[in-house]
């Protein structure tokens, strides 16, 4: 590669193309490929690099706690999970249809791992996603009420293609927090998908969200376009013999 060409690629921020140029040129000369095929190979390498960088950026923004993967989930240790059903969810048809997914089960059965694995699949397919623990979400809602930034918070969360709310359970909530959560779910209703992991059945949501009529309306929206998966199996956190 000439110094001029290297500088041009550097100025254009075509890092990957600059890194593979000599290798691809040598391979092209040996294989006697056409100029267009050679250029296509360079552009393809640059494109893949951009895609990988964009994915890493989206993953960082999504706040995934760990790089959970559906491929590495210990299905053999969790008979309560229907692997075929999870594979169907991994096709992301529920995201395309703006449907919700609620994973219900005791602590440690793998709800978060499966949910994060599905969120990663969505990220890999270019969707805007975010992971948030329920306690952190409600804390953020309370802080937004204090500084009058609720509308900004709702706008940010409502436009996400997939919002994963983890550990949705008994929390000490003020009525204003419950109201804000209802508004969020109302704005996401049949527009975007929400994944919720919880150890509570739907009949227990009234106990911590408060206002019965509001919770009934919330459940109507959450469950209308929704897949509910109940995981009844052993804890994956138990020591392995």
What is the role of each PLM region?
Residues 62-74:
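Conserved adenine-nucleotide phosphate-binding loops and their immediately adjacent elements
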Residues 54, 81-159, 208-209:
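Conserved P-loop
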Residues 4-7, 20-27, 72, 100-104, ...:
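Short hinge/gating elements
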Residues 10, 14-65:
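Interdomain "pre-motor" coupling segment immediately N-terminal to P-loop NTPase/helicase cores
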Residues 1-7, 239-241:
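Intrinsically disordered, low-complexity and often Lys/Arg-enriched segments
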Residues 162:
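Walker B motif beta-strand of ABC-family P-loop ATPases
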């Amino acid at each position: 590669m000439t110094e001029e060409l290297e500088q041009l690629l550097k100025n254009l921020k075509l890092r990957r193309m600059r890194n593979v140029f000599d290798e691809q040129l040598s391979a092209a000369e040996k294989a006697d490929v056409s100029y267009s095929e050679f250029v296509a190979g360079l552009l393809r390498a640059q494109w893949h690099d951009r895609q990988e960088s964009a994915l890493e950026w989206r993953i960082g923004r999504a706040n995934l706690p760990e790089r959970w993967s559906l491929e590495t989930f210990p299905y053999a240790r969790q008979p309560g999970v229907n692997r075929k059903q999870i594979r169907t969810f991994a096709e992301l048809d529920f995201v395309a249809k703006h449907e919700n997914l609620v994973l219900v089960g005791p602590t440690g059965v793998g709800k978060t791992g499966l949910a994060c694995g599905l969120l990663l699949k969505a990220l890999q397919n270019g969707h805007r996603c975010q992971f948030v623990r329920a306690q952190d979400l409600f804390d953020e809602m309370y802080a937004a009420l204090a500084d009058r930034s609720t509308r900004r918070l709702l706008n940010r969360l409502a436009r996400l293609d997939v919002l994963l709310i983890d550990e949705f359970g008994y929390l000490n909530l003020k009525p204003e927090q419950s109201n804000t959560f209802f508004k969020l779910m109302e704005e996401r209703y049949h527009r975007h998908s929400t994944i919720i992991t919880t150890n509570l059945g739907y009949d227990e949501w009234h106990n911590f969200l408060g206002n019965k009529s509001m919770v009934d309306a919330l459940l109507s929206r959450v469950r209308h376009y929704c897949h509910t998966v109940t995981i009844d199996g052993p804890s994956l956190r138990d020591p392995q013999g």
